[in-house]
Amino acid sequence: MRLKIAFKKSDTCFNNVSGGTAINMAPDSCTASYSVHGETKTLSVTGKAAHGSTPEDGENAISKLMNELSGVVTNCKLIEFFHEFIKLEYNGESLGGQVSDEASGPASYNIGKIETVGDDIVLYIDLRYPVTFNLEDIVNAINSHLSENGFSDVKVEVITNKPHVYMDKNVAVIQTLLSAYHDETGDMSEPTVIGGGTYARAMNGIVAFGPMLPGRELTEHQANEYIYLSDLILAKEIYKTAIKRLVSE
């Protein structure tokens, strides 16, 4: 789910800010031109990219830049906003939007992109929220929190919102898929709910299915994404067993 927050450039110290290329990725670079004590300066910060559903696996360059400037620049609304409500968090606690449920765990907030648009500086957030929560309620809670803490003129807006795809792990099709994984790997792990979008959105009543094998690093959507050849071969056997069981039931 994509959110945006716009700040008037005149209320900030920035002449220009640019960071991130995709909202659903933790940005690995950010550059800002800003004014301090009558001088114009430029700061560039590097981070580590990560998928937007797991921002904690990266180092957010936008947040790092704002954090570095917080001790240098005063009277800058955008920096004050980050210092008060974003910090280096990924769970939305200081923003007033921290939520969690048993089925899918806590929400994640990825500060995915920042750019200068005309007279505004626009911040974009990739939010992955739990399946039992309503996005409108979360956004209203955030805006109320901002208003109560001196930022009544700053509003979070929804850009896009795709409905959740969720199926209870106890339904027959999930148990069939899970049995194929258990039998082929010997790993008795339970199924996992992920925050990313998959082909399961294409049709009703389907789920994305694939192994997250114990001890393996998750590198999807990151630089140098890879899979062990042995794991790929094992995945083939899992899929083969799963398909046989699905068509025979």
Task: Specify the residue positions occupied by each region the protein language model found.
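Short beta-strand elements
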Residues: I5, A32, V36, V45, ...
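Hydrophobic residues embedded in beta-strands of well-ordered beta-sheets
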Residues: K41-L43, D119-L123
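An extended, acidic, His-containing surface patch that forms the Zn2+-binding/catalytic region
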Residues: S53-G118, D137, D153-E249
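Fold-level recognition of mixed alpha/beta catalytic cores in primary-metabolism enzymes, strongest
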Residues: M1-S63, A223-Y228, L234-A235
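Short amphipathic alpha-helix segments
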Residues: M1-F14, A32-S35, L88-P106, N140, ...
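Short, conserved charged micro-motifs
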Residues: G38-T42, T132-V139
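A common structural junction motif
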Residues: T42, V73, S144-F151, L246
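C-terminal catalytic subdomain
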Residues: I121-L135
